[in-house]
Amino acid sequence: FVGCGVSGGEEGALLGPSMMPGGSEESWKTLKPIFESIAAKAEGEPCVTHIGENGAGHFVKMVHNGIEYSDMQLISESYDLMRRALGMTPAEIGDVFEEWNKTELESYLIEITADVLHQVDKKTGKPLVDVIVDHAGMKGTGTWTVQSALDLAVPVTGIAEAVFARGLSGQAELRAEAQKQDFEGPSGVVPMAEEDKVAFINDIREALYASKIVAYAQGFNEITEAAKVYDWKIDLAAVARIWRGGCIIRAKFLNRISDAFENGEANVSLLFAPYFKDAIETAERSWRRVVSRAITFGIPVPVFASSLEYFDGLRSPRLPA
């Protein structure tokens, strides 16, 4: 028996996906040359490995999708802050994402976000993003990731808030009724000097990276706990390596994640590995400014905020729960 999670969509089908097979070692020995021949390649290595026994492969693919939800919601919140608070156009925001893709944030999702924000709708002449209905659908894997985390008692707060954000976007009637209520609260572009605007954009970049690290830390924590409960032997460094190509969340910093697990630096949490600990501490003040200012501006940032709250919960010597 083999259950294989496959990521990459249409492009992966054509150019090679990231594959996460689960099942017996004997089955893997038979299928390995076939899977390695069709998988995507990253730095010359095939993006496929035997994940573990039974349903381990599909479980890891499920968590991959949960992380993807969080990743995309963080990008959306970054866009929303620049659009609503700073009054930037989609094309201007696309330029920002292009620059961010030259930094530690380099990833497929940042790249395609920049591309989409530069697109213009041919029929209306408006930015394409402005003619897309703001109701996000779900296929279920993000929900399953959260449900499984609840069963395992593992907090995946960023992923959960990303799922709920999609759920709220789909509550069309409720949202329409809320607009009629004309609730009190801040709205509109925030007057800001150019140098302050530039500084805030940099704060958003820092907050995005810190929150992204938390999303991956939470996802890998869920995989770790599931491996204990279901008696799977999962090589987390190998999982990070096969996500470097072919899949939706492929990103530059997956090399850092792989190294952290390989070196034993992330055995308890990815956040404790020296590189990621330093990155979080470097971004911490920017992260707090983004969340606090978003609240002041009346702009929802559920994944930014929940990721910061998770970090603060971890570092608290005593919790009131």
Task: Please give the residue ranges for each predicted region.
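Inter-helical turn/loop segments and adjacent helix faces that build the functional surface
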Residues: 82-94, 149-154, 229-232
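Hydrophobic beta-strand scaffold residues
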Residues: 1-2, 156, 301
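Short alpha-helical scaffolding segments that buttress acidic/His motifs in well-ordered protein cores
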Residues: 63-70, 96, 113, 132, ...
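Generic long, charged, amphipathic alpha-helical segments
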Residues: 252-291
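Rossmann-fold dinucleotide-binding core
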Residues: 1-95, 102-127, 131, 169-195
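Small-residue-rich helix-loop
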Residues: 99, 103, 227-262
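A conserved active-site cap/scaffold subdomain adjacent to cofactor or substrate pockets
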Residues: 128-215
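C-terminal amphipathic alpha-helical interaction region
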Residues: 281, 286-321
